[in-house]
Amino acid sequence: MKMLLKKKAGFTLVELMIALVVIGILSAIALPNYNAWVKKSRRADATVALSRAQQLQEKYRVSNTTYSSSMSSIGASTTSDSGYYTISISSANTTDYTLTATPVSGKSQASDTSCPTLTVTQSSGNSTYSPAACWSK
């Protein structure tokens, strides 16, 4: 009598270890890139809030001949829409103002070291956005 042996199918331990190493390497590359992309996309939350505050400052100046030093007097929120940034007016007078978006501590955006704060400075009719690399224009 001839016995037929069934061939076992499956992965060997070595094959599984190789697959795990490949997954680990891909994860080590992909995760930091993903996190950087998320931080960059969340900066839009700050730029939108700063642009809105800029418009409200100009509207306020038409009626008051000076820029406001208070977010509440221009009708703007001190927090960005998604809550990742705090918006403030650093200085304001008749010809210029500075708006600043600072990441809220304890939120994921607080670890954004590339663009820790975003600033718009309006001076004599010219707007300056800094850091320039953090503004997608």
Predicted regions and their residues:
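A short, glycine- and basic residue-enriched loop/turn
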Residues: K8-G10, I23, S41, N64
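Periplasmic/extracellular, small/polar-rich flexible segments of pilin-like filament-forming proteins
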Residues: R61-K137
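Alpha-helical hydrophobic helix detector
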Residues: L16-N33
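N-terminal leader/signal peptides at the extreme start of proteins
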Residues: M1-F11
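Membrane-proximal N-terminal amphipathic helix
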Residues: A36-T66
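Short coil/loop residues immediately preceding or within conserved phosphate-binding loops
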Residues: K8, L20, D96
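Residues at secondary-structure transition points
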Residues: K8, K40-A44, V48, A92, ...
